[in-house]
Amino acid sequence: MTSVTLEAAPDAWAEQDAWADRKQFINPAGLEIAYVEISGAEPALVLVHGFTDTSRSFSLLAPHLAGRRLIMLDLRGHGASSPGKGFGIADFADDIAALIRHLQLDQPVVVGHSLGAMVAIALAARYKELIGGLVVMAGTLKPDFASDHPLVAGVQALRDPISPTDPFYDWWHACRPGVPQAFLAGLANDASAMPAARWRAILEEICRADLTSAAQGVRTPTLIIAGGCDPLFGEAHQQALWRCLAGARLLRAEACGHNPHWENPAFVARAIIEAFEA
C-alpha cells in the first residue's frame, strides 16, 4: 500500500470501506506495525485501540479531532500489524515507543481504550520521557476476569474461521443506539480475521496483567474517561485507576458503556481537547 499522510476530511475519515487502504507501515526490529495518520497541529495524539479492534476503532472520533495530528495504530497481532512473538502488555508498549521514536513525535498525548488504556499506562511508566499526556478510557489496572466471565467463555467458544456475524459480537460490540452499523460491521470483519488461538493468547495476557505498580509510577498529566454503564470495567475499576494515577482527573460518560468513543465521540473529543489544550 502507498505510504501517504492525508489531510483531515471529517466526512471521508468517518467512512469505513476504505479504512484499510489508508494504512502506512513501519518495521522496527523486524515487526511490521500498521498505522493511519491524519496531519494536523502538534502535539500529536497517539490513539491505541482495545482487544480485537484496530485503528478503525477511532474512525468515528477522528472527525471530532479535526485539525490535530492523529496517529492511530494497529496493535501487534491486530489488523494489518504483524503478530510478533509475544502479546504481553509490555510488548505492546514497546511497539508504541518505537512508533513514537520513528515518527519523531514530540511529547504526544497517548489515548488508550480498554486494552489500549492498559498499554498506555505501561508506556507512561516505562517511557516517561516520550509522552506528554495520557488518556485512560474504559481502562483497568487489573481485569481479574473469572473463568465464567462472558468474555472468557465467549473467546474460548470461538472456532476458526470466525464469522463476522457470530452472535458473540452482539455482546462484545454492544453499545447504545446510534452507532453506525457499517462501523460495527467493519470492526467485526477486522476481529474475525484474527485466528481464534490469537484471541485466546492475547486474552490470557490481559487476564494476568496487574498494572498497579506501573500506574503508581506515572507522573504524566492524566485524564480518565469512564463509561457510566461499562459492563467490563465499572466503578470499582475506575476508582482504583483514580487512586493510583497521581493527580488524574476522572470524567464519566454517564450514558455510555465500554466504548464511549463510539457512543459519544463528540463528548470524548471535547474532553481530550479541554484537558490538554487548556
Residue ranges and their predicted role:
Residues M1-L45, A66-R68, L105-D106, A193, ...:
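Alpha/beta-hydrolase fold catalytic core
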Residues L31-S82:
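Conserved HGGG/HGGXW glycine-rich cap/lid loop of the alpha/beta-hydrolase fold
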Residues D91-P108:
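Conserved acidic catalytic loop of the alpha/beta-hydrolase fold
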Residues I121-R126, I131-P161:
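Flexible "cap/lid" loop of the alpha/beta hydrolase fold
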Residues F145-P150, P161-G217:
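Conserved alpha/beta-hydrolase catalytic His-Asp/Glu region
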Residues V218, I224-A226:
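Short beta-strand/loop motif that positions the catalytic acidic residue
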Residues C229-F233:
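Acidic catalytic loop of the alpha/beta-hydrolase fold
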Residues C256-A269:
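Catalytic histidine-centered segment of alpha/beta-hydrolase-like enzymes
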